């Protein structure tokens, strides 16, 4: 959660190592099958036509890395749809496109482009009506095989209730902050500046970790409250954790000696600033003892907060929440980024949905989950660099996730590898999946990384436009 602050660079290295390990896990096949089994597949009786004109009854598209191969899918009649789901055996495809037409052999219109498919990729194309789909694999890292296609027209009355929840770094708030996206948000989690000490007291620090007066924090919160006045947006505070020394200070603040003081201070802080809830970003409990202390703390803070929102930033691995504790967590902000593929891509679609599946297997209900998306880039060589999406203005388009950008990483090393972002289309796909999978919402790290909302490539705009189009 702390990609933009130098203060926490050491922690990020730990997160990265853990994420690299996580990325070796299954790639989303199970949850994609479970999710879309609930909807009518409009391609279930389709015919697949090879480039030579031969027709086959089952969908298949295979080839070699150096080939640009395609098949045509005949739905049998002109069909209204908004979603195409493709599945691959393996992890080889790195670029594919979808075209559509109502004529078998001509007048094909470009619909869609993305990169990785793996266990399944939701391709959200908006409201369209066509008979023929032409699927191209443009690039792959080896022999590839696509084995399944689903075509759906999914609308939901529940789409309007999808949470759009963004972290906002308090230090970024000023009179010049861009708040043009506020109408697209339902929740804001205010991260940092306020920080715990080893006894659970709350102190205030600047971006370099130097202690400052609370008035700095209060003034920034006042700016945000003025901007959100009259809007139905929950404001939730996240008080930074005292990382370092194997979490010694965290263990101290959650210990039997200090936990009641920690809870008391959180409750007083939430009440003082009239926040709608409290979020905790604990990355990560490293022992059974830490998990025991964490579970005990969560019971206490839930009781103290009453009807206020209890939110947690959670990574989808090594979940050791007690069963009763899972039930009292209102929102799990699932961190689904900095998880790299063999190609060096972070936060690709299939790895993201696989993380959601792990949360469900870990005992969470789908409505508790906010699917985390990054509004920042990572270099494909995995160096320590996190670049804001908006810094690539002028290099962006709707579909491309790889950006060529020369700079120095946060350790001063020159960068030549491409930057991997989540494009407008990728964010749209993940939003559509969140609706289709009946998730609680979308979570963004972090708010000031985006372009202004009136920019056609704004990622907040991608979320909101998809959310609106998915409504019945």
Question: Where are the regions a protein language model picked out?
Answer:
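Aromatic, loop-rich ligand-recognition surfaces of beta-strand-rich domains
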Residues: 26, 55-108, 117-158, 331
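An active-site-proximal structural segment forming one wall of the substrate-binding cleft
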Residues: 255-278, 297-300, 304, 315-325
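Conserved, mostly hydrophobic/aromatic
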Residues: 188, 280, 332, 371, ...
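Glycan-recognition patch characteristic of GH18 chitinases/ENGases
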Residues: 156-265
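Active-site groove signature of glycoside hydrolases
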Residues: 263-291, 335-338, 443
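Sec-dependent signal peptide cleavage junction
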Residues: 18-30
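Substrate-binding surface in catalytic domains of secreted glycosidases
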Residues: 165-166, 198-216, 284-396
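Glycan-binding loop/region signatures in secreted carbohydrate-active enzymes
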Residues: 368-433, 453, 459-472
């Amino acid at each position: 959660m702390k990609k933009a602050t130098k203060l926490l660079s050491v922690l990020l290295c730990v997160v990265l190592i853990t994420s690299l390990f996580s990325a070796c896990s299954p790639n989303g096949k199970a949850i994609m099958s479970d999710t879309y089994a609930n909807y009518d597949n409009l391609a279930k009786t389709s015919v697949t036509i090879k480039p030579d004109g031969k027709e086959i009854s089952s969908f298949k598209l295979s080839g070699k890395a150096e080939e640009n191969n395609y098949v045509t899918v005949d739905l049998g009649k002109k069909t209204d749809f908004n979603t195409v789901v493709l599945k691959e055996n393996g992890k080889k495809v790195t670029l594919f496109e979808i075209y559509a037409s109502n004529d078998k052999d001509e007048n094909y219109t470009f619909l869609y482009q993305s990169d990785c498919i793996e266990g399944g990729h939701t391709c959200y194309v908006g409201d369209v009506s066509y008979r023929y789909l032409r699927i191209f694999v443009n690039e792959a890292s080896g022999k590839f095989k696509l084995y399944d296609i689903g075509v759906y027209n999914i609308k939901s009355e529940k789409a309007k209730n999808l949470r759009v929840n963004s972290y906002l770094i308090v230090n970024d708030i000023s009179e010049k902050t861009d708040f043009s996206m506020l109408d697209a948000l339902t929740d804001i989690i205010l991260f940092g500046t306020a920080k715990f000490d080893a006894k659970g007291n709350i102190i205030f620090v600047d971006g370099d970790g130097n202690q400052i007066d609370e008035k700095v924090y209060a003034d920034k919160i006042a700016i945000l409250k003025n901007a959100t006045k009259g809007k139905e947006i929950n404001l939730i505070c996240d008080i930074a954790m005292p990382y370092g020394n194997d979490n010694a200070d965290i263990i101290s603040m959650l210990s039997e000696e200090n936990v009641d003081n920690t809870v008391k201070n959180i409750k007083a802080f939430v009440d003082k600033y009239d926040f709608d809830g409290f979020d905790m970003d604990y990355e990560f409990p490293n022992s059974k003892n830490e998990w025991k202390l964490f579970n005990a703390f969560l019971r206490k803070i839930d009781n103290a907060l009453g009807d206020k929102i209890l939110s947690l930033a959670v990574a989808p691995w090594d979940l050791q929440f007690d069963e009763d504790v899972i039930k009292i967590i209102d929102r799990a902000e699932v961190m689904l980024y900095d998880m790299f593929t063999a190609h060096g891509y972070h936060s690709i679609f299939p790895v993201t949905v696989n993380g959601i599946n792990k949360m469900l297997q870990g005992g969470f209900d789908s409505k508790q989950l906010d699917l985390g998306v990054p509004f920042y880039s990572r270099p494909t060589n995995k160096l320590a660099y996190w670049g804001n999406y908006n810094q690539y203005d002028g290099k962006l388009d709707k579909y491309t996730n790889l950006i060529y950008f020369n700079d120095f990483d946060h350790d001063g090393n020159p960068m030549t590898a491409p930057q991997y972002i989540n494009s407008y289309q990728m964010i749209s796909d993940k939003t559509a999946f969140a609706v289709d999978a009946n998730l609680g919402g979308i979570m963004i790290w972090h708010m000031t990384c985006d372009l202004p909302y009136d920019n056609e490539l704004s990622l907040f705009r991608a979320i909101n436009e998809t959310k609106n189009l998915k409504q019945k």
